[in-house]
Amino acid sequence: MVSSTTPSSGEYLLEMSGINKSFPGVKALDNVNLKVRPHSIHALMGENGAGKSTLLKCLFGIYQKDSGTILFQGKEIDFHSAKEALENGISMVHQELNLVLQRSVMDNMWLGRYPTKGMFVDQDKMYRETKAIFDELDIDIDPRARVGTLSVSQMQMIEIAKAFSYNAKIVIMDEPTSSLTEKEVNHLFTIIRKLKERGCGIVYISHKMEEIFQLCDEVTVLRDGQWIATEPLAGLTMDKIIAMMVGRSLNQRFPDKENKPGEVILEVRNLTSLRQPSIRDVSFDLHKGEILGIAGLVGAKRTDIVETLFGIREKSAGTITLHGKQINNHNANEAINHGFALVTEERRSTGIYAYLDIGFNSLISNIRNYKNKVGLLDNSRMKSDTQWVIDSMRVKTPGHRTQIGSLSGGNQQKVIIGRWLLTQPEILMLDEPTRGIDVGAKFEIYQLIAELAKKGKGIIIISSEMPELLGITDRILVMSNGLVSGIVDTKTTTQNEILRLASLHL
């Protein structure tokens, strides 16, 4: 095991030392350490399943550690709930935000601890105190606004301000930029740095390497439930962090391009969605064996393109031509029959049935084809096809009866891709296919996509990660405010050119 020399106790706000946690048959944490200084932003990194979530659940009292010590501001702590941790100065901003959408911003800020005047809530004081915190953190949100009317980034600002209102000394941020625009990310980073200036220790969890190097001071890496290293970011490279995370060197982030795009198989002309505001006059071709990326800022209507092609959204104008024959996909069933497949953006909410097994999740898009002559399901063929998904997609699982929700994000995504391949599509559309997936699993997803393109599938990929689009696609269609602002060759374009096109119609 690799380890690093760390300074002695007394320099830290939070010290988790020698933390062990076991579940039946599994050692989830094996002598894990996490030490966070004041005035610092500390990255906590590791592949999915490395132990990050379990470690933090031990901190917040959701799980009780088997052994080890946790010191906060020099005193040993043993919280039994997240509420107790929050009241004592340790807060977490979750990826899934925990706000009451129907209530006002200031209601959410002070929920359960309203300032009172006699028997009544002191609305004026609540407004003043909320506004004072927002001003200090440079947050421009009306405290009286209803939370449900705000953007995701504004909701995250409220969560951070709420932590600040508890005088939190440790703030843990879990994938905070996954749904934000570049401008919103920069604003979030400004607020995080303000917390750092005020003496907070920030624990920052993200799979986005560029963010880690842009923002963080130190990094702790976990692998397979073990502490691997704690080091200053200044002395590390991206490749070294990846090697610590996966236990081996990744010589390349993207597979070699071996696909050879052939004839045009899909022609889209002047496609316009019925629901407004949406896409307008979208035109492009997709070649056999081509990987076409779709880029754009949040709100550019990238997802609307694939949802309209797949029949989820109704088109008001334009044509879709497949192999020279004009088609209309009025719903998902028609799209599947025409050879389209769609891996949706929100894997957890629309891609998987988390509490059902891999077998069900592998077959659900094609279930009607498993009926035999008497109308019963052919269990033998279903089992065979599930095994094909597991083997061909290289899914790491004990077996096809395993609950899919227990798999890592990368393995869940492999099952979803395999499910759609069972429908034998010609056009495979993937919306944010590697969101929330660790760096090792990302490469495996890229390999699968490259192999499918090499076999002649036409592939459309939507991604918010520019290096991903530049690394795996042949061409990139750039969207801006529902319009196509350009189609560029990946070999000759630059990130700056794509960003320029993405801002063209704003």
UniProtKB/Swiss-Prot annotation:
InterPro entries: AAA+_ATPase, ABC_carbohydrate_import_ATPase, ABC_transporter-like_ATP-bd, ABC_transporter-like_CS, P-loop_NTPase
Record's keyword terms, sorted: ATP-binding, Cell inner membrane, Cell membrane, Membrane, Nucleotide-binding, Repeat, Sugar transport, Translocase, Transport
E.C. designation(s): 7.5.2.11
One Gene Ontology term of the molecular function aspect: methylgalactoside transmembrane transporter activity
Repeat among keywords: yes
Membrane topology: Peripheral membrane protein
Purpose: Part of the ABC transporter complex MglABC involved in galactose/methyl galactoside import. Responsible for energy coupling to the transport system.
Family: Belongs to the ABC transporter superfamily. Galactose/methyl galactoside importer (TC 3.A.1.2.3) family.
The protein's name in its UniProt record: Galactose/methyl galactoside import ATP-binding protein MglA
Organism of origin: Escherichia coli (strain K12)
